[in-house]
């Protein structure tokens, strides 16, 4: 069987759907549905069972899954970069991940997990090297620490981590303020015809802060490729390799709707010193490992995403 943690979340649910498209429904979906609206992400998916994340880790400890699991796609985490409860973050992200990793090692199961580009923090280079990793918040630190743990041990099973850059696309609507700018810009254009972007900061002009915006479909493809290549382990960047500006995203949304304009708002004081103004994945190691597929640009991915959003009807919309 296949286990997907964070299965009702953004990337996890896209992964479940992609596995369904490959003919797999022997999937245990693990999540926390305290936010019941996340069920929409699984409503069109086929799974064998659903387990709350606390019940799942208990059953792992009891040995109920021993010898039964082909792969764990560990996508579940507290992903809020504004959460500063370190004790909670370490238990939820770091210790939980270690428990699943050691289960996979004992059982010979593949372990493919979500890391994050946030581990690079204020760095201006994004290469999988220790000296470039400078986390700026406790979420990033929890991800960094687990990557370090993986690096320090020689596991006999596949252990592969993907440092996601700025992922956007279908099934992120439950994330609220943490959803992508593509999602928010789309809502803003529909509501008022105006996209609101931050003014210049940190040496960047208005709206010209640069991020590596990567479409969720492409992120899922890298996960599936790792699963299909169990001999590949390590920690890899997962982005397009090409930074684009927030203006690019706003203009893609405006072009899609055929209307709209951009308004620049003051850069928030609370984000100063804790904000990545530039990210761009260095894909050298991923390419060297054998991944050859192309990644969609903002101009390609955003219209596809907005087509999907236009066809959805979520609670509150």
Curated annotation (Swiss-Prot):
EC annotation from Swiss-Prot or TrEMBL: 5.1.3.20
Keyword NADP recorded: yes
Ligase among keywords: no
Family statement drawn from the similarity comment of this UniProt entry: Belongs to the NAD(P)-dependent epimerase/dehydratase family. HldD subfamily.
Domain of life: Bacteria
Upper classification of the organism: Bacteria, Pseudomonadati, Pseudomonadota, Gammaproteobacteria, Alteromonadales
Originating species: Shewanella loihica (strain ATCC BAA-1088 / PV-4)
Binding site for NADP(+): 10-11, 31-32, 38, 53, 75-79, 92, 143, 167, 175
Record protein name field: ADP-L-glycero-D-manno-heptose-6-epimerase
Xref: InterPro entries: Epimerase_deHydtase, Heptose_epim, NAD(P)-bd_dom_sf
Protein purpose: Catalyzes the interconversion between ADP-D-glycero-beta-D-manno-heptose and ADP-L-glycero-beta-D-manno-heptose via an epimerization at carbon 6 of the heptose.
Binding site for substrate: 166, 177, 184, 198-201, 211, 275
HAMAP family linked: Heptose_epimerase (MF_01601)
